[in-house]
Amino acid sequence: MTLHSNSTTSPLFPNISSSWIHSPSDAGLPRGTVTHFGSYNVSRAAGNFSSPNGPTDDPLGGHTVWQVVFIAFLTGILALVTIIGNILVIVSFKVNKQLKTVNNYFLLSLACADLIIGVISMNLFTTYIIMNRWALGNLACDLWLAIDYVASNASVMNLLVISFDRYFSITRPLTYRAKRTTKRAGVMIGLAWVISFVLWAPAILFWQYFVGKRTVPPGECFIQFLSEPTITFGTAIAAFYMPVTIMTILYWRIYKETEKRTKELAGLQASGTEAETENFVHPTGSSRSCSSYELQQQSMKRANRRKYGRCHFWFTTKSWKPSSEQMDQDHSSSDSWNNNDAAASLENSASSDEEDIGSETRAIYSIVLKLPGHSTILNSTKLPSSDNLQVPEEELGMVDLERKANKLQAQKSVDDGGSFPKSFSKLPIQLESAVDTAKTADVNSSVGKTTATLPLSFKEATLAKRFALKTRSQITKRKRMSLVKEKKAAQTLSAILLAFIITWTPYNIMVLVNTFCDSCIPKTFWNLGYWLCYINSTVNPVCYALCNKTFRTTFKMLLLCQCDKKKRRKQQYQQRQSVIFHKRAPEQAL
């Protein structure tokens, strides 16, 4: 947009003439020009709204009517879109439970900062430009600047927090994600706002009392202590160039790590296909353990103390009869493993939506499958790397050897019967470490040697192989889903960072140039550069909608006023389910 003035001085920059050339005495940024958090002009081309003959009483500030209409219409549309977009983000977070994730808490904080800019900063700045003077008084000026700077600083701080959160989530999934809760996210968001407030609000509001006088002329509004180009440039370095550099480096690391995960997952799926035609015993690799520890130092400490134990997983099975018919039935019903509790238990304990490979620990693991009626030990050492449930010997829980001996003795009493019990509900799958004791010599011989495999019945071998393949498939599926979520989060982050860099860079380049060439930047460019920084708050909700399908569908639902319909459908569904339940209850009682 192009703004003109009837006076010889610029209506936006008091020390810039109509030809935009400074005299030597006017070196540096104009009196009314200060950086907005080191990134854009808070007086924003506000200027010394007075002509050489005295203050102007023109409410249009020397602009024509059509210029005022154009400026008011354009900036009003931008402010309205900013307000509506960020309100949609906040309301969507409130009404849609699927959006209440840790990632979106940071986006919610960013939306609050953008909403403040759209409601307060944009409109006051538009009035400032149109009237060519600040007509609301000194207190309103200082409050506006304080709110504007705090909200903008909070936006940058939130972007930094989001970048670090994504980086640690991908590079340290086990250690960081265990601590990554909504409470911790709230603390980080609170710190971002508190730091922003402490950095800017006291200095803006009370600087005139610190120095003993107010040097901002009447009719102008700018930060008193940011009047020198060198100070302005210093704040730009600290507030824009450094954060952008840090965020760019973090995003590059996130991108490389995501690409690495994609290749690993492709190899994992390929090895899973080969495993279906081979034995389920594979060489081990790195990372996951059922105890969720990943620090090798802790593992070595447990090894030095020579503590041994095992991790138990239980699953429910059907009644088992040791007959050929039952064996044939079990052999043909591989799909029944899809719905048992073992799959769910291992799936939940071995992987989650927000867990990935984070440890470089290399170890050999063994699974001991003990079935009632048989003391056969199935050695399944060297499970596949990050895909299977791996239990380092040093990380297993401590178990008293006497209790283990009692358990073996109890199982032996069942063996004396010569047959399986007619029905049982629990089968223990025990992940055991080597125990160098005479009482468990049979266990030690099979676990301690990674190549020894005792003869198994056809039934046991089939069940064990199915179990291993099902577990592998489920963990692979979990990892694939987790990778998809990470990619979506990375896409949202990349869109936000790209919008931030595009909208904030032009003004900060002008700040850099103005430090060395104070007459090179036209006043109109200062205006556009500052407004472009404000437009970042307008673009952010669009980034959320483009990169997140849940946000997009929720926005559509809110804009079309479909919230009540969705609630009614949900209530009707719950009522139907309640009626069905009450109808079935008497029948089951009979």
UniProtKB/Swiss-Prot annotation:
Superkingdom of the source species: Eukaryota
Keyword Metal-binding among UniProt keywords: no
Annotated motif Basolateral sorting signal, positions: 275-281
Key words, A-Z: Cell membrane, Disulfide bond, Endoplasmic reticulum, G-protein coupled receptor, Glycoprotein, Membrane, Phosphoprotein, Postsynaptic cell membrane, Receptor, Synapse, Transducer, Transmembrane, Transmembrane helix
Carbohydrate attachment residues: N6, N15, N41, N48
Bilayer topology term: Multi-pass membrane protein
Phosphoserine: residues bearing it: S385
SUPFAM superfamilies cross-referenced by the UniProt entry: Family A G protein-coupled receptor-like
Region (Disordered): 323-357
Gene Ontology terms describing biological process: adenylate cyclase-inhibiting G protein-coupled acetylcholine receptor signaling pathway; G protein-coupled acetylcholine receptor signaling pathway; G protein-coupled receptor signaling pathway, coupled to cyclic nucleotide second messenger; positive regulation of smooth muscle contraction; saliva secretion
Residues on Cytoplasmic side: 92-104, 165-184, 253-491, 547-590
Transmembrane portions of the chain: 68-91, 105-130, 143-164, 185-206, 230-252, 492-514, 527-546
Residue ranges, Extracellular side: 1-67, 131-142, 207-229, 515-526
One MF annotation (Gene Ontology) recorded for this entry: G protein-coupled acetylcholine receptor activity
One Pfam entry name: 7tm_1
Subunit structure: Homodimer; the dimers can form tetramers. Interacts with NALCN. Interacts with TMEM147.
PANTHER family, A to Z: 5-HYDROXYTRYPTAMINE RECEPTOR, MUSCARINIC ACETYLCHOLINE RECEPTOR M3
Family, per entry: Belongs to the G-protein coupled receptor 1 family. Muscarinic acetylcholine receptor subfamily. CHRM3 sub-subfamily.
Functional summary from the UniProt entry: The muscarinic acetylcholine receptor mediates various cellular responses, including inhibition of adenylate cyclase, breakdown of phosphoinositides and modulation of potassium channels through the action of G proteins. Primary transducing effect is Pi turnover.
Protein name: Muscarinic acetylcholine receptor M3
Lineage: Eukaryota, Metazoa, Chordata, Craniata, Vertebrata
Gene expressing this chain: CHRM3
